[in-house]
């Protein structure tokens, strides 16, 4: 017989979204917000833990004098994201382009996916993977989801093969656009201060990488991806 915790999970899934037999209902946002605000001061500010992130050696800022902004009131609704309607999504232009090479930031594509390169930033390379068809991350068909996993592994290995890179950081947020998109940050080698979750913050302050250096990195990565996974290099990487 399955353990009780497994049975509770099974009843949760088998009785609709929140089954009657689930031993505790999921917390509402009102309850969550009230619990957060109960720990805030009179200005709505949360305290910074003495052993929190500002104590990490990878934190980009001096901790002295640092304070959090006040927690804002609950919004009535979340603002709609760009591309909620498929006909207004940026992916329409991707599919209608006569040649992928005409899309300036695109460096790789196959029948279902594309990879674009970000504007020059502080790290050696930032790439973005997205499906050509209009899907959010949680609505990808099984076939596309399986492809995504394979591309992510191959792309990560290609990025980590760059001589200036030790690791690839993978990020998915999705608050700005409704179309699925995943970011790949190249973390510089032998710079341990840039490791971990603060890399995206450091990226804003590091000097911009020259365009020709960025393009050379993108070209090496996409050619490696073509060799190990497939697809074709386009645009700056062709």
In which residue ranges do the predicted regions lie?
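Active-site microenvironments that recognize anionic phosphate/pyrophosphate groups
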Residues: 6-124, 228-238
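Glycine- and small hydrophobic-enriched segments that form the cores of compact globular domains
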Residues: 101-115, 137, 141, 147-151, ...
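Active-site helix/loop of acyl-thioester processing domains in fatty-acid/polyketide metabolism
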Residues: 146-162
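A short glycine-rich, hydrophobically flanked beta-strand micro-motif that places a catalytic Asp/Glu
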Residues: 163-176
């Amino acid at each position: 017989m399955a353990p009780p915790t497994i049975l509770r999970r099974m009843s949760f899934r088998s009785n609709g979204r929140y089954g009657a037999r689930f031993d505790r209902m999921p917390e509402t946002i009102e309850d969550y917000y009230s619990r957060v605000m109960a720990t805030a001061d009179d200005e709505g500010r949360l305290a910074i833990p003495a052993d929190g992130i500002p104590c990490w050696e990878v934190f980009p800022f001096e901790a002295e004098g640092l304070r959090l902004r006040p927690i804002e009131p609950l919004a009535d609704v979340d603002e709609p994201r760009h591309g909620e309607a498929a006909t207004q999504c940026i992916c329409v232009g991707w599919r209608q382009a006569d040649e992928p090479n005409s899309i300036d930031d695109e460096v790789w594509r196959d029948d279902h996916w594309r990879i674009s390169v970000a504007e020059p930033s502080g790290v050696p390379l930032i790439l973005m993977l997205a499906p050509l068809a209009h899907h959010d991350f949680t609505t990808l068909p099984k076939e596309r989801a399986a492809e995504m996993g394979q591309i992510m592994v191959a792309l990560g290995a290609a990025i980590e093969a760059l001589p200036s890179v030790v690791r690839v950081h993978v990020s998915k947020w999705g608050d700005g656009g409704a179309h699925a998109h995943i970011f790949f940050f190249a973390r510089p080698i032998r710079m341990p201060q840039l490791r971990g979750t603060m890399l995206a913050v450091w990226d804003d302050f590091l000097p911009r990488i020259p365009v020709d250096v960025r393009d050379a990195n993108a070209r090496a990565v996409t050619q490696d991806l073509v060799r190990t996974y497939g697809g074709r290099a386009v645009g700056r990487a062709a």
